């Protein structure tokens, strides 16, 4: 079941990317909020 392993790895990868994007967004929002 290579597909199952691949899809689980892929979803893990997507989760990591989403988390990083969220953190980046959070930081930039905080930065913008501090600037105003």
UniProtKB/Swiss-Prot annotation:
The gene is gcg. Pfam families: Hormone_2 (PF00123). PANTHER family: GLUCAGON, PRO-GLUCAGON. The keyword Secreted applies. GO terms for molecular function: hormone activity. Coiled coil: none annotated. Belongs to the glucagon family. One of its GO terms (cellular component) is extracellular region. Promotes hydrolysis of glycogen and lipids, and raises the blood sugar level. The keyword Cytoplasm does not apply. Keywords: Secreted. It comes from the Eukaryota. Produced by the X-cells of the islets of pancreas. This is Glucagon. It is found in: Secreted.
């Amino acid at each position: 079941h290579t597909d199952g392993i691949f899809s689980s790895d892929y979803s893990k990868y997507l989760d990591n990317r989403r988390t990083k994007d969220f953190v980046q967004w959070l930081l930039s929002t905080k930065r913008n909020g501090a600037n105003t």
